[in-house]
Amino acid sequence: MLEKKIEIGGVYSRVQCYFQGHRKFEGYIGKDYISFENLLRENTIPTLTVLIRKELLLKYIEEIKPERQNWEMGDYPMWLWIAYKSKFYFMNEITGVYRILNESVSHSDSVDRHIEFYNSCRDIQHYFIDYSHRFDLLNWVEEYYNSRMYQLCLEQNYIEIKSYRDYFKTIKPTSFKTKMFKISANYRICEYLMKICLQNIFIRKLYNNINK
């Protein structure tokens, strides 16, 4: 494809996921998100399948100077730059296996690690919004970021993330999806705290009965 079409700057395909902890294959990574706009919202390009033009790689390093940036990911900024300057081509077939570890930059059981990763993605997205002057995409990026944070609130231990509740209160969701995430997150946290209160009441009554 790179040889046939000069306007194509990079190609990629899909990968099958292998979960190291469970020792099983499950799911796939890789979508037809070849536009700058779609990639700005979500990175769906498996790095191990990518083939890009050498001249684009050298120009990216010279212009963006990624080694000077404090980014957690080295591949995502490059995909955004290539999608903005050139075009990606998506091959809808599986050409590799992506091994998911229990602890890595993008996959972790730590709430703080998740937040670090999301914040780093957001920094990269903001950088390329400024770079491309596509400020019309800012709300779109913020909505997706907020949705991921609400999901984290629902999925993780609520005691761990109560320090982040103040952040959620400052967000003014504009889309219906994000509003529902926020309502659901608040409900689940209240439900969890109520359960803790009931458990404490039960334990106190049990203790009093034993000591009678």
What is the role of each PLM region?
Residues 44, 61-62, 71-72, 76-77, ...:
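C-terminal subregions of glycosyltransferases and related glycan-biosynthesis enzymes
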Residues 13-14, 19-111:
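Conserved nucleotide-sugar donor-binding catalytic segment
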Residues 5-15:
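A short, conserved acidic/glycine-rich loop-to-beta-strand motif
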Residues 4-5, 37, 75, 138:
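Intrinsically disordered, low-complexity segments enriched in polar/charged residues with Gly/Pro
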Residues 1:
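Acidic donor-binding/catalytic loop of UDP-sugar-dependent glycosyltransferases
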